[in-house]
Design a protein with these regions (language model features):
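A short acidic (Asp/Glu
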Residues: 89-97
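Short His-Asn-centered micro-motif
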Residues: 82-86
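ER/secretory pathway lumenal C-terminal domains and tails of membrane proteins involved
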Residues: 1-70, 74-77, 97-173
Length: 173
């Protein structure tokens, strides 16, 4: 019930999610929602705490870790990455906060009609309908950049210099 209240608040009311944590037998099951709340509320302390707790309780598989790592590496310095799901936003926060990867990046919860910050990137998981609203966007690896005047240089640099490819190499071997 508490999580439903949290969802109905647009994931902006902290009382129901903290009540759900208090009542839960499996605290780690509530951590993803606390991570989402902390990103929406821009609470970096809470984000670090619960991303690290979730990572300790339920580490990402090597394939998922590499995907999330490469997603973070698809952005330039001091980027803002917009996502909105448990599968993308929470995984990115876990890798970033628990392993200190790309702490220069700000993670944001994407909402329709919001003003996007400069140096903005969208997660592919936002879907075609959202990405299509930005006709000048371009792929940078596992993200879409909204920065003007992009070309394939950024994509090429990320793939050649920044990406981990161990799991990909393993998959084709």
């Amino acid at each position: 019930y508490q999580l439903i209240q949290f969802f109905h608040s647009g994931k902006k009311n902290k009382e129901p999610v903290f009540k759900a944590l208090q009542l839960a037998k499996d605290k780690a099951a509530i951590y993803p929602y606390l991570i989402q709340y902390s990103i929406i509320a821009n609470d970096k302390t809470l984000l670090a705490e619960y991303a690290q707790k979730l990572y300790a309780a339920s580490p990402l598989t090597p394939n998922v870790y590499e995907y999330q790592y490469n997603t973070l590496m698809s952005a330039n310095t001091n980027a803002v990455i917009y996502a909105r799901g448990i599968g993308d936003l929470v995984g990115l926060a876990m890798v970033q906060q628990a392993t200190n990867i790309r702490k220069d990046i700000t993670l944001k919860y994407y909402e329709e009609g919001m003003d996007l910050e400069p140096n903005a990137y969208l997660c592919l998981s936002l879907g075609r309908e959202v990405i299509a609203k930005y006709p000048n966007a371009y792929y940078t690896g596992l993200l879409v950049s909204l920065n003007p005047a992009g070309d394939f240089t950024e994509l090429s640099n990320h793939i050649s210099n920044d990406f981990k490819k161990e799991r990909l190499d393993y998959a084709v071997a």
